[in-house]
From Swiss-Prot:
Task performed by this protein: Sulfur carrier protein which probably makes part of a sulfur-relay system.
Keyword Cytoplasm: yes
Primary location: cytoplasm
Name of the gene: tusA
Family: Belongs to the sulfur carrier protein TusA family.
Protein name: Sulfur carrier protein TusA
Taxonomic source organism: Shewanella sp. (strain W3-18-1)
Keywords: Cytoplasm
Amino acid sequence: MNDAFSNAQHKLDALGLRCPEPVMMVRKTVRQMAAGETLLIIADDPATTRDIPSFCEFMDHTLIASETAQTPYQYLIKKGL
């Protein structure tokens, strides 16, 4: 795990969950965060490789980093305003 992932302020384990559950959990978690805080998402659903980046773009959050070469996938997002 690179430093960006290890320094996340919040962590969400979505392993074993299938679409649409991971994105629903991300949305719920992000709502409880302050603007600028970071969230590490760990998932193994292949749909997250498309859904998490789309969620960030649609909701004006920043996808700081992602590792999707193999499972578990990791995503680091920063909450927007």
